[in-house]
Amino acid sequence: MNILFLEPAFPANQREFVRALAAIGANVYGIGERPYDWLDDETKSRLRGYWQISSVTDEPHLEWAVREAQRHFWVDRLETVIEAHVLAAAHVRERTGIPGTSSRTAWLCRDKVAMKAALREAGVPTAASDGVSTLADAEHFARMVGFPVIVKPRDAAGAAGTFRADTMDELQAVARACGLADGAAVAIEEFVEGHEGFYDTLTVNGAIACDFVSHYYPNVLEAMRTRWISPQIVATNRMHEPFYGEIRALGRRVTEALGITTSATHMEWFYGPKGLKFSEIGCRPPGVGQWDSYCAAGEFDLYREWALAVCHGTTDRAPSRAYACGIIALRPDRDGHISHYSGLDDIFGRYRDLIVGHRFPSPGTGTQPVEAGYMANAWVRLRHPDYDTLRQVLNDIGETVTVHAR
């Protein structure tokens, strides 16, 4: 099959999807914003061709590249796995006659207000929400549902541009910070109290072929705002437990409601005093290299299963569930440049056999801000057969390692 893949080399994790497609015999062609010469040699060796355009979200330019490819060969699929690219790819697919995720599905997985309306219509519990473009409308919503409220871009990804307001005064400050006070259209939602996690799937022809559940410790907004916290994301191997059955059942309902056919999915959820509620839905894989955790935990190549699903509408391996797998982010103690680490010898001495991935930027490397994400600075990924033991190990690493900056 001939597959067009958007941004085949950046961010670095994109290369795994290209690798998997090439490994099952697909002819892979790239469309991206970087010059071909900037691609790494391994990715170049796996591409049959490449078109550079100014922006992969600029639909006329993307459509030009796709039609150029179609002039030379039959294009079976146009694939992307990055949130910001999903809607543009869907629009261009429909204009060029290429099968795949529809524009409706892509839009429902991108526009937070429409997404939650579709979930409520399907009977999926979710936060009360609305789209607003004036402070007065936001204040009216807050009076209706009560504080706290969450304000975010309608097309937000992760915690980017997300604010919490606990009072009218804070809501007015948020309105100025996010542009609402100047007429920007944003999504506003009730704050859902509870533990936060996510449900990820590989869905084939509308049926969930394999699935995973991960937990945030602590919840994302707190993790992305608090330097001293070493936040964790942990994938469970206890999918047989009743609570996960409830998540899976709602996940199937979401898949049907949004019209997801063959795609990776990412579904955020909260569990608290009001029960289980689904939040953001993405028609793409999770971020923070989480598929690498699923591969390590399940003793299989999830990227290959995705490639088989895209190219042949099937998968041939399931995760073993032998391990739980988690990542812990280790933040610098201040902004600046890395000077040194303390505690590394201790954790490698204790847990070397559990570690399946890590990154410790060399001294002199500039630090990244806390809000840049879980893998922006130092991190460690580990697996263990027992979920609770893994949590204890991750906690110990967070208490032992210090990333010093100056």
Please place each PLM-identified region on the residue numbering.
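ATP-binding N-terminal substructure of ATP-dependent carboxylate-amine bond-forming enzymes
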Residues: 1-105, 136, 332, 361-366, ...
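A conserved helix-loop-beta module that forms one wall/lid of the active-site cleft
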Residues: 94-161
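Conserved ATP-binding module of the ATP-grasp superfamily
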Residues: 125-129, 144, 148-151, 163-198, ...
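Short beta-strand-to-turn element immediately C-terminal to the catalytic PLP-Schiff-base lysine
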Residues: 132, 162-167, 202-204, 272
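ATP-dependent carboxylate/phosphate-activation module, predominantly the ATP-grasp catalytic core
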Residues: 190-260, 264, 271, 278, ...
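Flexible, glycine/charged-enriched surface loops at secondary-structure junctions
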Residues: 261-267, 316-321, 404-406
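A structural supersecondary motif
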Residues: 265, 347-365
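A glycine-rich beta-turn/hairpin centered on an aromatic-Pro dipeptide
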Residues: 308-352
